[in-house]
Amino acid sequence: MNKVYNTVWNESTGMWVVTSELTRKGGRRPRQIRRTALAGLIAGLLLPSAPALAVDYNNETLGSGATSSSMSLNAGDTATDTTINSGGSQRVSSGGSATSTTINSGGFQYVSSGGSATDTTINSGGYQHVSSGGSATDTTINSGGYLSVSGGGTAVDITQNSGGVIDTNTYATLSGTNINGSFSIVNGSASNMLLENGGFLSVLNGHQATNTTINSGGYLSVYGDGSAVDITQNSGGAISTDTSATLSGTNINGSFSIAGGSASNMLLENRGQLNVNSGHQATNTIINSGGNQHISGGGSATDTTINSAGFQYVYSGGSATSTTINRGGNQYVSGGSATNTTINSGGYLSVYGGGTAVDITQNSGGAIDTNTYATLSGTNINGSFSIAGGSASNMLLENGGYLNVNSGHQATNTTINSGGGLRVSGGGTAVDITQNSGGAISADTSATLSGTNINGSFSIANGSASNMLLENGGSLYVNSGHQATNTTINSGGGLRVSGGGTAVDITQNSGGAIDTNTYATLSGTNINGSFSIANGSASNMLLENGGYLYVDGGHQATNTTINSGGILSVSGGGTAVDITQNSGGVIDTNTYATLSGTNINGSFSIANGSASNMLLENGGFLYVNSGHQAMNTTINNSRSTMNVLGGGSATSTTINSGGYQYVSSGGSATSTTINSGGNQYVSSGGSATDTTINSGGSLVVFDGTAVDITQNSGGAITADTSATLSGTNINGSFSIANGSASNMLLERGSLYVEGGHQATNTTINGGGSMDVSTDGSATNTTINDGGQMYVSTDGSVTSTIVNIGGFVNLLGGSATDTTLNEGGRMLVNPQGSATGTIINRGGYQEILRSAGAANTIINGGQQSVLSGGSATDTTLNSGGAQYINNGGSATDTTLNSGGAQYINNGGSVTNTTINSGGGQYVYINGNVTKTTITDGGILQVDAGGSASQVTQNSGGAIVTNTSAVLSGTNDKGTFSIAGGSASNMSLENGGLLTVLVGHDASDTTVGSDGTLSVQSGGVLRGTTTLTDNGTLVGNMVTNEGNLYFLNNSAATFAGTLTGTGTLTQEGGNTRFSGLLSQDGGITLHSGAAMTMVTLQANANVTTQSGTSLTLDNGSILTGNVTGDNTGAGDMTVKGASVWHLDGDATVGALTLDNGTVDFRPSATTRLTQAFRPVSLVSESLSGNGTFRMNTDIASHTGDMLNVTGNANGNFVLDIRNTGLEPVSAGTPLQVVHTGSGDAAFSLNGGKVDAGTWEYYLNKENTDWYLKADSSQPGTDNPGTDNPVPPVRHTTKSADAVLDMATAPVYVFNSELQSLRFRHGDVMQNTRSPGGVWGRYTGSDTRISGGAGSGYSLTQSGMETGGDTVFDLNESRLAVGAFVSYSDNSISHNRGGSSTVGSTGGGLYATWFNNDGYYVDGVIKVNRFRNELRTWMSDGTAVKGDYHQNGFGGSLEAGRTFSLNENTWIQPYLRSTAFRAESKDISLDNGMKAKAGTTKSLQGEVGVNLGMNLDVAGTVVRPYLTTAVSHEFSDNNRVRINDSYNFTNDISGTTGKYGAGVSAQLTANAGVWAEASYQNGENTESPVTGSVGFRINF
């Protein structure tokens, strides 16, 4: 009989499997109580259903409040919006997927290898586990939620909210966000992990972790060569590591680290652990509650603090120095050594034999636990103490401290306080003991002791003990022939006196225990008065709290009190009278003894072989011997037992919970009541009459007799058919007689039907079981929840009904006409057989090796055939499932609607018929032969599976992929899949073929509701036909043949379709999105309608009249569209869609709905240097949209739109702009022709840039042309008949070139204008020998340029320099040098922003005399970095960069007059000159220009008026200035595209008005500021400002 079962999850098959150990021996079960494991039931509950094709679960709830507790998702299965409550579980196996799952408290989700879970929410108490190879995406972990990811598992896009738990290691792959930001684990490296509330990260050998945060309840494990740096260990966070790892971070004590075998400042708490390896060390460690430090041999720890519930272990060869043990802290020294340990109150130091602890400081309340084999030294409150060489001195034992003095060893001056303990073994010696209250001494009279206790002096010497105090765990053992006097036994103390020993003058206080027998001699007092034992007579003994008295035969005891924990044992022939048996007191005796006394039931006695009213509890025992009797016995708890021996009898016995009555052969029991937890055993030859079995009670009868039984509900009977039984149960009368059992009720009980015997009409309820042995039989058995039936080899059962929770195990036996209802299970073991079984919904049958099932009907239930098992003539109806596992087989199976057969790895099936709605599913290494698929049936063959000699009738579906092996016939002939190639497959009515990477499919037909799925790298060959609503799917499909859509009513493809093949559509409607490229092109005929939606297409299209092609929602088609000999099809371009022409094209009706037709070269032709115009011929045009066109106005060629018929609508011509110059700007270029209609065309931006000039669109009749002049004629010439020629406009590029040609003049002059003020600083500091100065300048100038150009110049810059002043008697001369830089932004009036960076430097000299005359001269050189930026009319950006050099200077003369004491006036004359070099300019739009030498010459006359003020000791000089300047340069030349000359005339007069102030802050430092306004013929500067400083030497 298989008695021990284990269930093991098999990762490869994705299911639970059952393993067993054979325990049956000799063909018959041993006759003893059994609690058989319900292995089949467990297997059935844990065994998930095998995957069916594409099972989709939506809005399911599992667990509490739901109808189902579990869900298994296998290959192809999906589950969406699942809620998993308490007790619910979801397992996602390989190929299965779960989306939008919510896991609540007590719910579980398991994602196995190959399974996936997306968008999971884990609430408090919920659990998600991702196994190796499994994946989870977008998991949200709320507070208390738990995510576990095994090594090799993947979880990405995690949201870990506060309190959410992650448990993983560095072999896993994770990413997501937590309250600290983004975190990840990849390639063995973990970053920014948050561990809290049970979170766990294991950093494996050679891996690493950075920026880990460990909050309370979090756990970080780092061992070996692993490393973890930048750790934040908050309070309650745990680290487990060893000193071979590398760690660094901060804890509440500051920075900590482990490096090079050295650990510093570690905090160990809440399961944290540090292993200090050999040769390594740890310093400044703090061990809090739950923390552990282990110091191996050769390792060391220094400055360790051990707090409450912290532990330090020092092993052999290890050492610990300067350890502090606080209250609740523990240090264990086992063969190692500890030095300088301080034990504070409540601290605990344990030193094992062979361990060493020296320089101990034992403070008051500190505990030391050791023995005299250890070595110790230190100080306590009594001074120095030590243990060495087996001798202990001055030890203090308290608060859990303990000293064991071994035989031959000694202890002197020992103090034992409350909670301390001293044990002295026989032959050991302890003298000068001080035993204070609560201190415990344990010894026997072979030891030698002396000392004082609260009673005075005590001693043990030469086998004599005197004045001993026993309490709080203390004990004294008086050996035979030894004696003890004046012993006091308090609560918790114990005195044991052997036979022949003597103890007198005993004081036994409440709770004190005496253990002895009537051969000893005792005297003393207890709470009942005087007691004694002498000459085999005991009087007034008190037995409690472990006390024991044995009264031997012929001896006696009187007035014995037995309290809880006390035992009185009276041997046969012994006498004990006047017993008081209180609750919990134990009597152990037999009916040969003589007893009398009282218990809680009243008076009891045993006399003359008759026992009456005995109470057996707390392990008490009564033997009823032959010829004797027991009446009115009560048997209570703790296996209290009555044995009724042969010839004995028991009457009116009550057996309560934990009580036992055994009736041996020849014994008898009458009128027994068995209550819950009570047990009565009737052995062979024994008898029981009138037994009542109440709920929870148990009667066991093997070969014995029990009659007149009353079996109440919940009462258990265990028997075999060799027994004789009769009685009544809830079903009526029952009996066992002559090997026949009838109407038995088994609940928690068992019935063993032996060979040749039988059982009929048996009911088996929860906990009940029936075993049918070899040649035994059972008929009409009903098995309910928790009931079990076992049928051994050659045993047989017939007409069995198995309800929910019931289980039948055929151990080589047979079962006929069994019905398995919901939740019922049958296991058919080797050599077993089941015939005519009906498996209803929820029922389950499993066939093991060498077992078989025949003529089975499965109505919604399941049958599983394991290795070596077989099933024949099986019919599966709706909801029925048959699983053929490795080595299992099935023959002649019929699958009706809703029935499913699953062939797993190594399973084989022959002669299956699949009717409509039925399904056969073949998994890897599964094999089927001679399967017939009728209309509506489905055959699914997974990768690695095989199916041969298949007959696929019309309407039959095949679901498979190119890694399977198939062969058979269909309507087209022979089909096959082998070696990754599929040929002549027919897919309809749910059929699916998946073409895997590197595989191909030839001549496939996809009919109604069929699907052809092509993975990236899969190839289609031959003719692939999609008819009716057949579907093609795939992210990337390669077509090397002809992809033929034949009258497909609604074909939709989303993905990438490429290859050298062709796409043909005959009739029907198709929609394509993604990417499409077919070298053989696309052909539309017979009214075909193709819509491209968000598609990138690259193919030439041939259309037939009556067909239509639509581009929608941003689609892009690159290729020619042409008609055939019947004409051309219609074309529509909608929304943001674009049609790129790669050549001349012809369409029927062209409709633009905000779409674009692009004549410009595509990416594939853009590298072609020579421009080739393209023409588009359309029969008609309507709608609105854009035509992007190319022109080469320079060669007078361009693209052409030719509408032969009617054109209506509004269209924009987006014609590419250029900077190149046409040959002739006056010749029109035709771009559009229409046959008729009112279509309106306009240019994008209203014009086209071509070189220097802008071109405009002009209409002539139904043709449209590009011309260089505007569409409006010029104005009339007064007095003539000739109008003024139309106006031409320069392009923005030309304007920008003209702007940039003049910019250096204004930049230079502005810098020079600011520079002139520096001479005033020199003149103000007449006594200074020189100095340094600096100033910042800023301006905003609006400038008019040549040919209508203009711009704004914004300048900001700085200048700095220094000079030396020479004294020339009546005058002075300042000579200096300077450098400058300015950043100049140019905003062109017609668009664009250019920049000029100006870097310069120069020399200056200023002469001035005492009469106020001055002359100032400057020479300056500049380098200009010019960056031109503008746009053409079509919005195309234009740029050109170049550098330019320039130089110039100024000369100024004037005189300062004093009008009065504080007022002065300064008239002056100034001239400036500048010249910038000629420069060739090239723009990236093809425009070229030559800026000639740019010149400037200015004259200026002006006056400054100011005052000198003394403000708080500081000289402040406010002033006003006005001047008139004239520019003389009017002929700066610019030539564009070597075709057109332009003149930049910058001449004109400018007025200047300003105000400023300077201040001499100290004798050596001054500052100034000025603002001015300038306005002239070509310029206006609303504001120009400067600020500066000077520091004198």
From Swiss-Prot:
Matching entries from InterPro entries are given as: AIDA, Autotransporte_beta, Autotransporte_beta_dom_sf, Autotransporter_adhesion, Autotransporter_pectin_lyase_C, ESPR, OM_autotransptr_brl_dom, Pectin_lyase_fold/virulence
Q: Which GO terms describe its cellular component?
A: cell outer membrane
**Domain Autotransporter, first and last residues per copy:** 1325-1593
Gene knockout outcome: Severely reduces bacterial colonization of the gastrointestinal tract of orally infected C57BL/6 mice.
Where is the protein localized?
A: Cell outer membrane
**The keyword S-adenosyl-L-methionine is assigned to this record:** no
Q: Which residues form the signal peptide?
A: 1-54
Q: What is its main location?
A: membrane
> What domain of life does the UniProt record list for this protein's source?
Bacteria
Skewed-composition ranges (Polar residues): 65-85, 1269-1280
* Annotated region described as Disordered, given as residue ranges: 65-100, 1267-1286
Record key words, sorted: Cell outer membrane, Glycoprotein, Membrane, Plasmid, Signal, Transmembrane, Transmembrane beta strand, Virulence
Query: What are the Low complexity biased-composition ranges?
Result: 86-97
UniProt's post-translational modification comment states: Glycosylated by heptosyltransferas BAHTCr. Glycosylation is required for adhesion to mammalian cells and colonization of the mouse host gastrointestinal tract.
State the membrane topology.
Multi-pass membrane protein
> Domain note for this entry?
The signal peptide, cleaved at the inner membrane, guides the autotransporter protein to the periplasmic space. Insertion of the C-terminal translocator domain (beta domain) in the outer membrane forms a hydrophilic pore for translocation of the passenger domain to the bacterial cell surface.
Q: What does this protein do?
A: Autotransporter required for the colonization of the mouse host gastrointestinal tract, possibly by mediating bacteria adhesion to host cells.
Matching NCBIfam families, A to Z? Answer: autotrans_barl, O_hepto_targRPT
- UniProt-listed PANTHER family: AUTOTRANSPORTER (PTHR35037:SF7), C-TERMINAL REGION OF AIDA-LIKE PROTEIN (PTHR35037)
What's the protein here called?
Answer: Autotransporter CRAC
Q: What gene name does this entry carry?
A: CRAC
